[in-house]
Structure formats: structure tokens, C-alpha cells
């Protein structure tokens, strides 16, 4: 459906079950050209140590024609927008996703959740907000979308939210997609795979986008070139190996 997947977890997050090699093989089989490994930030109970993220610098950029982005799904820690990604971790990572997770930031009222999310968006440290339609964390959707558009941060539509977790996300995610459309922002699609078998599956995301007539030219996953141009506009150095994608 789309050749880029921006959200997945490996065995380094111990509630996930596939390796980097598993994802590469599945990407090659499915025609995925570029993906990002985004294991949970170290403040989560079963997350990898921060050295795991720093040492991603040893990964090859391209394997069997598949591009690999070094990423993290960091945790929003407080209303100041702090995340559990810092220091040398930033030097090794291409893609910073951040979102709410109950073990790190418990659900609050709409005003508090919105304050924390907007502070994270405005921090300049994050490229994508993960699953902002989670019904456990109500937010002021229009305010979030406007802040994201202003700061060039994408809001995610997460396929797993409609299948395995965060049940009841459909209405919120339609509202998120519509608000991003109206604000002229970016949407990022993530399979949120915890096994390689679901890599690149955006079936439920597509239903949400179609329901609000979301413009294709504001979806980051449409091509590797679009996603890389977005990241480079946010300060990522061009990766020569990705030129052939």
C-alpha cells in the first residue's frame, strides 16, 4: 500500500517478537523500501537500555535494497514535554517518535494531556507524535493539529490502534486526521508492528483517511523521498545510501 513504515518494535522491547533481520526479510518480501525501528524509550519497564539506541550507529543503512532508519518511540514524561531521549541518543537517531504510555505518564484530564503533548511538539526534539487518538488520553484535537503543523511535527494514525490496542480510537483518529487536513499538517502512518508479519499493514489507517478525504500529498509514507525530505527539513543529514531508494 505504502513503501514506508515508521513505527515498529523488535525483541529489544521484550513484549515484541521479531528481530531486525526478520523485518528486513519481510520488507523485501512485501516491497517496503524504507522502515524505522522504533523501540520503546528506556523509561518503559521492558524497554532497552539507552546504550541500545546509542549503538544503532553500527547498523548498516541499506540491506538487500531496504533502507533502515534508526528510531525510538520515546515516552512523554510530564507537562513540560520532556521525553526519555537525551544526550548521545539524539546523535545516533534519525527519527524521534513520542507518545503517551501509562507506565510513564498516567492519563490526565484533557487540559493536562493537551498541555503535555503541545509542549512535546514545541520542544523541537520530536518528529512524530504516536497514537494521538488514544481514547485514554483525551486532547484538544484542533489545538494539537495546529501546533503540529506550526512546528513541522507529524501526527500518527496507528494501525494497531484499531486491531490490538487502544480500542475505541476510531472516532478520535478520524478527528485527528480531519484536524491535520484542515491545519495543513502532516500525517504519518505506523503499523506499530510487534511482529514482522504486520509490517506495512495500513489497512485500517486507510479507512480513517478515506473517511475524511485526507490529501495524499500530506502523508509522509507515500515515498522514501518524501519522508527523507521531511526529516532533512528538520535537520537530519542526508544519508548517501538512501539516494537509490
Swiss-Prot record:
Q: Record's Gene Ontology CC terms?
A: cytosol
Q: How is the cofactor bound?
A: Binds 3 Zn(2+) ions per subunit.
Q: Which UniProt keywords apply?
A: Hydrolase, Metal-binding, Zinc
Which Gene3D superfamilies has this protein been placed in? Metal-dependent hydrolases (3.20.20.140)
Q: Under which main EC class is this enzyme filed? A: hydrolase
The UniProt record gives the binding positions of Zn(2+) 2 as 15, 40, 194
Residues engaged in binding Zn(2+) 1: 7, 9, 73, 192
Q: Which GO terms describe its molecular function?
A: phosphatase activity; zinc ion binding
Q: Which InterPro entries match?
A: Phosphatase_YcdX_put, PHP_dom, PHP_phosphatase, Pol/His_phosphatase_N, Pol/histidinol_Pase-like
Q: Report the cofactors.
A: Zn(2+)
Q: Which GO terms describe its biological process?
A: bacterial-type flagellum-dependent swarming motility
**From which domain of life does this come?**
Bacteria
Q: What Enzyme Commission number(s) appear in the record? A: 3.1.3.-
User: Quick check: keyword DNA repair in the entry?
Assistant: no
List of residues binding Zn(2+) 3: 73, 101, 131
**Which protein family is named in the record?**
Belongs to the PHP family.
State whether it acts alone or in a complex, and with which partners, per the record: Homotrimer.
UniProt protein name: Probable phosphatase YcdX
Amino acid at each position: 500500500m505504502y513503501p514506508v513504515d515508521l513505527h515498529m518494535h523488535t525483541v529489544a522491547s521484550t513484549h515484541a517478537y521479531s528481530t531486525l533481520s526478520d523485518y528486513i526479510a519481510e520488507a523485501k518480501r512485501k516491497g517496503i523500501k524504507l522502515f524505522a525501528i522504533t523501540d520503546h524509550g528506556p523509561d518503559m519497564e521492558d524497554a532497552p537500555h539507552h546504550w541500545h539506541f546509542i549503538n544503532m550507529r553500527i547498523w548498516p543503512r541499506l540491506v538487500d535494497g531496504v533502507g533502515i532508519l534508526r528510531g525510538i518511540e520515546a515516552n512523554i514524561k510530564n507537562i513540560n514535554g520532556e521525553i526519555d531521549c537525551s544526550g548521545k541518543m539524539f546523535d545516533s537517531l534519525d527519527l524521534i517518535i513520542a507518545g503517551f504510555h501509562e507506565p510513564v505518564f498516567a492519563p490526565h484530564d484533557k487540559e493536562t494531556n493537551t498541555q503535555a503533548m503541545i509542549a512535546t511538539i514545541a520542544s523541537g526534539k520530536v518528529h512524530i507524535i504516536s497514537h494521538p487518538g488514544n481514547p485514554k488520553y483525551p486532547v484538544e484535537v484542533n489545538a494539537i493539529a495546529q501546533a503540529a503543523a506550526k512546528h513541522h511535527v507529524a501526527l500518527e494514525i496507528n494501525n494497531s490502534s484499531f486491531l490490538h490496542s487502544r480500542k475505541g480510537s476510531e472516532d478520535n483518529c478520524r478527528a485527528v486526521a480531519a484536524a491535520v487536513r484542515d491545519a495543513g499538517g502532516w500525517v504519518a502512518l505506523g503499523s506499530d508492528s510487534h511482529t514482522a508479519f504486520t509490517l506495512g499493514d495500513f489497512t485500517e489507517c486507510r479507512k480513517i483517511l478515506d473517511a475524511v478525504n485526507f490529501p495524499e500529498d500530506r502523508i509522509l509514507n507515500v515515498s522514501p523521498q518524501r519522508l527523507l525530505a521531511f526529516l532533512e527539513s528538520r535537520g537530519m543529514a542526508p544519508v548517501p545510501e538512501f539516494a537509490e531508494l
